[in-house]
Curated annotation (Swiss-Prot):
It is an enzyme of class 7 (translocase). The gene is nuoK. It is a multi-pass membrane protein. NCBIfam families: PRK05715.1-2 (NF004320), PRK05715.1-3 (NF004321), PRK05715.1-5 (NF004323). It is found in: Cell inner membrane. HAMAP family: NDH1_NuoK (MF_01456). This is NADH-quinone oxidoreductase subunit K. Its EC number is 7.1.1.-. GO terms for biological process: ATP synthesis coupled electron transport. It catalyses: a quinone + NADH + 5 H(+)(in) = a quinol + NAD(+) + 4 H(+)(out). NDH-1 shuttles electrons from NADH, via FMN and iron-sulfur (Fe-S) centers, to quinones in the respiratory chain. The immediate electron acceptor for the enzyme in this species is believed to be a menaquinone. Couples the redox reaction to proton translocation (for every two electrons transferred, four hydrogen ions are translocated across the cytoplasmic membrane), and thus conserves the redox energy in a proton gradient.
């Protein structure tokens, strides 16, 4: 039994939806960043699946660019979360109000 493109895309859609639900329902900044990374990994899975299905390496090269952007996003996001924790002593998004003077 061979795994077809539809199976990869279904798995990718499931992982992406799990990431979206994590972003929409969680209030912890670290969990939100992890959910965003989950969404990016779902996109990477789709790129690799299409690359394999079309016998083209362009999708696999795109994954490296997405991984680079994801690493930069994680580094900047984690730095922001650490800064907020040092100032507000919480990583809960509801308790952080930056617009309040």
């Amino acid at each position: 039994m061979e795994i077809e493109l539809g199976h990869y895309l279904a798995l990718s859609a499931f992982v992406f939806i799990c990431g979206v639900l994590g972003v929409l329902t969680r209030r912890n900044a670290i969990i939100i960043f992890m959910s965003i990374e989950l969404m990016l990994n779902a996109v990477n899975l789709s790129f690799v699946a299409f690359s394999h299905y079309l016998s083209d390496i362009a999708g696999q090269m795109m994954v490296f660019f997405v991984m680079t952007v994801a690493a930069a996003e994680a580094a900047v996001g984690l730095a922001i979360v650490i800064s907020l924790f040092r100032n507000k002593q919480t990583v809960n998004i509801d308790e952080i109000n930056l617009l309040k003077g």
